[in-house]
Amino acid sequence: MHVKIKAFEGRVEYDFKLDNGDGGHPDGKTKMENISVYFKNPLINEDIHNDILCVVALLIVNPFIANKLSFSIPVSNKFVTSANKMLSKYKIETEIDHDLTPREIPNHGRPGLAFSGGCDSSAALCIMPPETVPVFLERPMSE
């Protein structure tokens, strides 16, 4: 799958293009097609680190990727290396900007957890630090 990403003041756009084998969900019921989505928020600015923009894309489409994921914007080497250590079903194969400094944790940053409400994410939340923010990514299911 290839993801085209554009960040503007107040808006981020994602254009997802499937490769052969992409689009199926492990549940066998849900499918993904080529789609464009956007997020509007006044806090969004064009200075969002590329690694953050790409991890958002990864979280949106993770279950639907068959072999590889690439992005239209370069990412840090640390992002690709770290993500590929965690991924087992597919790998990230994209342009690496060796001059791009990996995103640092802000001084008052808090850990986040992609939270589904299921057993695994509930267990993960139990062992995370108390200041962890559980983030639920709403994926409306078709009937």
Report the location of each language-model feature.
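ATP-dependent adenylation/nucleotidyltransferase module used to activate substrates
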Residues: K4-E143
